[in-house]
């Protein structure tokens, strides 16, 4: 544990940010999993709507600094390619 007051405050801030990032990444994984499940089931209309949701969540996570913006774009591109190949 830190002894300096400012370092103790930073530990609290880091814990909050870590919890937020963990929550956002979990939501991303869930959204991607649901998209892939609907794609595997052959429900393409639902997959299209879920892809829009995944894209939105990925770009929001990139805007908040949870993931890099290039990673978000790459994931969106790969998921869209996966959808287009399935259709």
Swiss-Prot record:
KW rRNA-binding (keyword) present: yes
GO CC term, one of those recorded: cytosol
GO term, biological process aspect, one: translation
Keywords: Ribonucleoprotein, Ribosomal protein, RNA-binding, rRNA-binding
GO molecular function: small ribosomal subunit rRNA binding; structural constituent of ribosome
Taxonomic superkingdom: Bacteria
Family: Belongs to the bacterial ribosomal protein bS20 family.
Role of this protein: Binds directly to 16S ribosomal RNA.
Protein's recorded name: Small ribosomal subunit protein bS20
Species assigned in the record: Alkaliphilus oremlandii (strain OhILAs)
Gene: rpsT
């Amino acid at each position: 544990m830190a002894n300096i007051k400012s370092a103790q405050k930073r530990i609290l801030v880091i814990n909050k940010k870590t919890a937020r990032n963990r929550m956002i990444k979990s939501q991303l994984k869930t959204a991607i999993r649901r998209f892939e499940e609907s794609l595997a089931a052959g429900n393409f209309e639902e997959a299209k709507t879920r892809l829009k949701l995944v894209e939105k969540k990925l770009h929001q996570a990139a805007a908040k600094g949870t993931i890099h913006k290039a990673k978000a774009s790459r994931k969106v591109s790969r998921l869209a390619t996966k959808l287009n190949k399935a259709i």
